[in-house]
Amino acid sequence: MENLYDVIIIGSGPAGLSAAIYAKRAKLSSLTIEANFASGGQVLNTYEVDNYPGLPGISGMDLGSTLRAHAEKMGAEFSRERVKELVLDEEIKIVRTRKNEYHARTVILATGAEHRALNVPGEKELSGMGVSYCATCDGAFFKA
């Protein structure tokens, strides 16, 4: 069977990249499918990350790049395309994109999350400069 992997990971945020690293450490064939222009997921929109052990004050873009580089160093394979259909009710799962059809014994969905914008005036322009979407993440930036 062509394009058969032990694991296909859909999403390349921190969870997807962690799954890719662990799959390679376990000597599994894997493919990570990402729809976005860069790996990292929602963290890419974060100005400064202060709660990731060992990398205090790293930007979200740099953290995403660091996680991607780690996965690549382990031998992770990536494809930039959007998944349009999943067939998960058979032993060999099918993942279809616009361009390709892949097969896997296991599919990991790590599609992440996205904050919900309020769409109020100034929200976009002030995001990261007073407008925040995570009180737990950003609360320390606003303490007196």
Regions found by a protein language model. Give the residues of each.
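Beta1-alpha1 glycine-rich phosphate/pyrophosphate-binding loop at the start
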Residues: 5-74
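FAD-binding core/adjacent interface of flavoenzyme oxidoreductases
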Residues: 1-10, 31, 38, 45, ...
